[in-house]
């Protein structure tokens, strides 16, 4: 697939398979196209004037850019967690229940169950169970990011996209997010953009290296980090440029 912003070709001839129930890390220097590629996977680039995708991106064999695709339904299946925590200015409970309510769920007992299971899934329940109806803005940065993950889990996605989810967090919060990602891959396919080579090596099963809008190399993380085929991959991983 190719991505254009107007006449500018931001991504060139990208061909990449994302394995199910694995963590795939997208690495590369700033401006290489990895975040642009991530946003293609749930059509977030649709929100940018002049952006268009040529080629196909399939989820379970169906082209997500085909005419008539319900983009809201797609984004329910392919959730996204952004670089900086973005909780809504409402209670912790209402943040998590927001998605299910948008999709028509009104039964309190069902919402209660979704909220608890989503917060448990994001390893946050024990920290907030006694203050569910307090503002989410009172949480720490790391807690807010886990709340945003819980909010994504609440609509039962198949894929989770994460755009540098720990870059704005302290080391302890980052470690919790990384541990959570390792746990979540048993149930979800995860694609994560990261500038942190050590983080990519720790948490991912597969790694894809982007440079100047091209996919240079991808494969099992151990292979990419210890025996890359392309000299540019080795130069980036070893810090010769970036």
Swiss-Prot record:
Enzyme Commission designation: 7.3.2.1
Binding site for ATP: 28-35
Catalysed reactions listed for this entry: phosphate(out) + ATP + H2O = ADP + 2 phosphate(in) + H(+)
Keywords, ordered alphabetically: ATP-binding, Cell membrane, Membrane, Nucleotide-binding, Phosphate transport, Translocase, Transport
NCBIfam families tied to this protein: 3a0107s01c2 (TIGR00972)
Function: Part of the ABC transporter complex PstSACB involved in phosphate import. Responsible for energy coupling to the transport system.
GO terms under biological process: phosphate ion transmembrane transport
Protein name, as recorded: Phosphate import ATP-binding protein PstB 1
Family: Belongs to the ABC transporter superfamily. Phosphate importer (TC 3.A.1.7) family.
Alphabetical list of SMART domains matching this protein: AAA
Quaternary data: The complex is composed of two ATP-binding proteins (PstB), two transmembrane proteins (PstC and PstA) and a solute-binding protein (PstS).
Keyword Membrane attached: yes
Keyword presence, Transport: yes
Lipid bilayer topology: Peripheral membrane protein
Signal sequence, renumbered to the chain: none
GO cellular component labels: plasma membrane
Molecular function GO labels: ATP binding; ATP hydrolysis activity; ATPase-coupled phosphate ion transmembrane transporter activity
